[in-house]
Amino acid sequence: MGPHFTLLCAALAGCLLPAEGCVICDPSVVLALKSLEKDYLPGHLDAKHHKAMMERVENAVKDFQELSLNEDAYMGVVDEATLQKGSWSLLKDLKRITDSDVKGDLFVKELFWMLHLQKETFATYVARFQKEAYCPNKCGVMLQTLIWCKNCKKEVHACRKSYDCGERNVEVPQMEDMILDCELNWHQASEGLTDYSFYRVWGNNTETLVSKGKEATLTKPMVGPEDAGSYRCELGSVNSSPATIINFHVTVLPKMIKEEKPSPNIVTPGEATTESSISLQPLQPEKMLASRLLGLLICGSLALITGLTFAIFRRRKVIDFIKSSLFGLGSGAAEQTQVPKEKATDSRQQ
């Protein structure tokens, strides 16, 4: 591996931060630079320009080495998430340049312009880390794993602040559940934490261990007046010293009286009055008109049915009358013809 790769690494370190370049601590960045030197440069930059390019790289390295550092702006450490974010951004832009197949002086210009922009981008990542993620605990002792950019080593850093994280006043009604929460927002991100221990503190400066374990809350069901008083929560660490201490002052309030709601089937006087008043309200004109139309429709239907029934009944009576009249005349004539015959028969016999 020639001196070109070493100078590229130095240029990258200088361009990305005004100190030792943290992104060079990422193995994927080192592999990408090796590929750039061995695979891309030979076919995209004439040999006669290699020397001039490397002189510019060397000058860039010197310029960044001479920058004065502001300790408040950059502390030379980052966490794993910040390093990964900066490395991914750099590799993405480097791949964009190599995929474009740019050559010659244009390649050199784009490479150094990309390094300049990546320096600004990574600086914003570092500033955000130092403001939001570096030692975020406002109290207690947090153990945070950091990466030292000077030697790319990971070490556990102790963010030491006051052990005392204050006192909390808790009010709970009698016969309700008491819940004491000892967890702080940075506990999950800290390393080297052990168990939560809850103590009952008595007036004679003595205390009794109530519970110990991984649970960050202490729950006591159906508290009584005897549960009022002082409690203390202590979170342990691997350093044999507490990470946080929180004090609780518990006040047990009188038992809450719950109002009994009446059954839905029982009508109270107020409800009866309301219902009666609602029933006595006059109907709206639209409802009155609809009810009248419905009544007229029903009456008309009944009258029509009655008329049809009566007409059918009358028709049947007329038909029966006609039939009876016709049959009645025929039987009378037959009787008249039969009488003379009988008389004739009698006269013959005589």
UniProtKB/Swiss-Prot annotation:
Essential sperm cell-surface protein required for fertilization by acting as a ligand for IZUMO1R/JUNO receptor on egg. The IZUMO1:IZUMO1R/JUNO interaction is a necessary adhesion event between sperm and egg that is required for fertilization but is not sufficient for cell fusion. The ligand-receptor interaction probably does not act as a membrane 'fusogen'. Acts a ligand for the human-specific oolemma epitope FCRL3/MAIA during fertilization. FCRL3/MAIA replaces IZUMO1R/JUNO as IZUMO1 receptor after sperm-egg adhesion, which permits species-specific gamete fusion. The chain crosses the membrane at residues 293-313. PANTHER family: IZUMO SPERM-EGG FUSION PROTEIN 1. This is Izumo sperm-egg fusion protein 1. The keyword Ligase does not apply. It comes from Homo sapiens (Human). Monomer, homodimer; disulfide-linked and homooligomer; depending on the context. Interacts with IZUMO1R/JUNO. IZUMO1 and IZUMO1R/JUNO form a complex with 1:1 stoichiometry. In gamete recognition, IZUMO1R/JUNO first binds to monomeric IZUMO1. The weak, but specific interaction with IZUMO1R/JUNO induces IZUMO1 homodimerization. The process follows a tight binding phase where IZUMO1 bends the entire structure towards the sperm membrane side through a thiol-disulfide exchange reaction. The molecule no longer binds to IZUMO1R/JUNO and instead binds to a putative second oocyte receptor. GO terms for biological process: binding of sperm to zona pellucida; cell adhesion; fusion of sperm to egg plasma membrane involved in single fertilization; heterotypic cell-cell adhesion; sperm-egg recognition; syncytium formation by plasma membrane fusion. The modification Phosphoserine is found at residue 325. Its main location: membrane. The lineage of its organism: Eukaryota, Metazoa, Chordata, Craniata, Vertebrata. N-glycosylated. Glycosylation is not essential for fusion and for proper protein trafficking in sperm. Disulfide bonds join 22-149, 25-152, 135-159, 139-165, 182-233. The keyword Disulfide bond applies. Izumo is the name of a Japanese shrine to marriage. Glycans are attached at residue 204. It is found in: Cell membrane; Cytoplasmic vesicle, Secretory vesicle, Acrosome membrane.
